[in-house]
């Protein structure tokens, strides 16, 4: 597949609106349609290129993900345009009836068959946004989540027909779900109006699901969050999506993590940033202090004499773990010298003496130092 951007493939700008994208795709689809260019592999590839680009750019969520992350951001949702994708184009063109209707005589149609397949179909994938604390992202944790999803009706086993009956083959389309006809260069298939593309008709529908074969249920799932996840990490749970029509298999569930803001730590990649206050005496004389770490423990850190406010110290290996790999990032500690707002008389005298020893001239200092 071409490495060109989807915008370049369709010949539109990144700011193109829906109508411009649709119009550009319409022209390319008609020009490179395989039924019009039989045996031409180059046209076939260009047709698939254009279809892949349109499939992403016509969907606001997919387009946003593509604009932000490129093809990597939509690699799981582009419909799979690799080897063997040509035979599955009926799935894609089932959604493109509005484009081809003008050229193929109305209805949801395409040279690849248009309407829905009559046999079992794979269910839709689901997405679940999960908020995760920074501690859980560092250590890993098992979450219990509840999702609404379509499941096969238990009363009819997904057939849509009531007990004691079964779906019958549609007499008009012979079970294909499509009515075919030829127009010029194009072999056009429109959705069968009798069975609405299913290939079967149900004379006695199941009362529980209304003949759909699917019911919405709520399912509780345990999700293991591995150490090192970050905002935008996507965890795939196979077979936990929605059940497919006509007894088809379940799709997949994608859990997308969103890391909550922490009151102490700021995350930068796999490193953690912590601001730690120290006293004036500790900054001048040096000290050994304890700082919190993301695992809930304390780490000892040496403050050398003469430390300045804003100085950064590194605690190696105390950051976030690398997802799916060994090792951790570092924890960077920014020290801030805390100046007392109130001091005792004795402390004032000592500071004034310190100032004189340092050769500092502080006019009118008596009674005014550190008073606010």
UniProtKB/Swiss-Prot annotation:
Binds 2 Zn(2+) ions per monomer. Residues 5-70 form the J domain. CDD domains: DnaJ, DnaJ_C, DnaJ_zf. Disulfide bonds: none annotated. Zn(2+) 1 binds at residues 153, 156, 206, 209. Zn(2+) 2 binds at residues 170, 173, 192, 195. It is found in: Cytoplasm. Keywords: Chaperone, Cytoplasm, DNA replication, Metal-binding, Repeat, Stress response, Zinc, Zinc-finger. One of its GO terms (biological process) is protein refolding. The J domain is necessary and sufficient to stimulate DnaK ATPase activity. Zinc center 1 plays an important role in the autonomous, DnaK-independent chaperone activity of DnaJ. Zinc center 2 is essential for interaction with DnaK and for DnaJ activity. Belongs to the DnaJ family. Participates actively in the response to hyperosmotic and heat shock by preventing the aggregation of stress-denatured proteins and by disaggregating proteins, also in an autonomous, DnaK-independent fashion. Unfolded proteins bind initially to DnaJ; upon interaction with the DnaJ-bound protein, DnaK hydrolyzes its bound ATP, resulting in the formation of a stable complex. GrpE releases ADP from DnaK; ATP binding to DnaK triggers the release of the substrate protein, thus completing the reaction cycle. This is Chaperone protein DnaJ. It comes from Leptospira interrogans serogroup Icterohaemorrhagiae serovar Lai (strain 56601).
């Amino acid at each position: 597949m071409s490495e060109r951007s989807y915008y370049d493939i369709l010949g539109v700008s990144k700011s193109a609106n829906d109508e411009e994208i649709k119009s550009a795709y319409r022209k390319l689809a008609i020009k490179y349609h395989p039924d019009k260019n039989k045996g031409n592999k180059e046209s076939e590839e260009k047709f698939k290129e254009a279809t892949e680009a349109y499939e992403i750019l016509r969907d606001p969520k997919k387009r946003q993900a593509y604009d932000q992350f490129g093809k990597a951001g939509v690699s799981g949702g582009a419909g799979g345009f690799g080897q063997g994708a040509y035979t599955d184009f009926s799935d894609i063109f089932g959604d493109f009836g509005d484009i081809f209707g003008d050229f193929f005589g109305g209805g949801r149609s395409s040279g690849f068959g248009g309407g829905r397949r009559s046999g079992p179909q794979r269910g839709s994938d689901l997405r679940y946004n999960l908020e995760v604390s920074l501690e859980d992202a560092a250590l890993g944790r098992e979450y219990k989540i509840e999702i609404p999803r379509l499941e096969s009706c238990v009363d009819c086993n997904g057939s849509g027909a009531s007990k004691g009956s079964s779906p019958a083959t549609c007499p008009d389309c012979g079970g294909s779900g499509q009515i075919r006809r030829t127009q010029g260069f194009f072999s056009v298939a429109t959705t069968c109006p009798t069975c609405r593309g299913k290939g079967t008709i149900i004379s006695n529908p199941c009362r529980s699901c209304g003949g759909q074969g699917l019911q919405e249920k709520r399912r509780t799932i345990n999700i293991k969050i591995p150490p090192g996840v970050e905002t935008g990490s996507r965890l795939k749970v196979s077979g936990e999506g929605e059940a497919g029509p006509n007894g088809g298999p379940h799709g997949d569930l994608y859990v997308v993590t969103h890391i909550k803001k922490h009151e102490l730590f700021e995350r930068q990649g796999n490193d953690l940033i912590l601001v730690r206050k120290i006293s004036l005496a500790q900054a001048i004389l040096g000290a050994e202090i304890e700082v919190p770490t993301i695992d809930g423990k304390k780490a000892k850190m040496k403050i050398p004499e003469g430390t300045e406010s804003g100085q950064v110290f590194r605690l190696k290996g105390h950051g976030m773990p690398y997802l799916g790999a060994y090792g951790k990032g570092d924890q960077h500690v920014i020290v801030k010298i805390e100046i007392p707002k109130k001091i005792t008389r004795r402390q004032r005298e000592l500071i004034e003496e310190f100032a004189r020893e340092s050769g500092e001239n502080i006019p009118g200092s008596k009674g005014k130092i550190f008073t606010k």
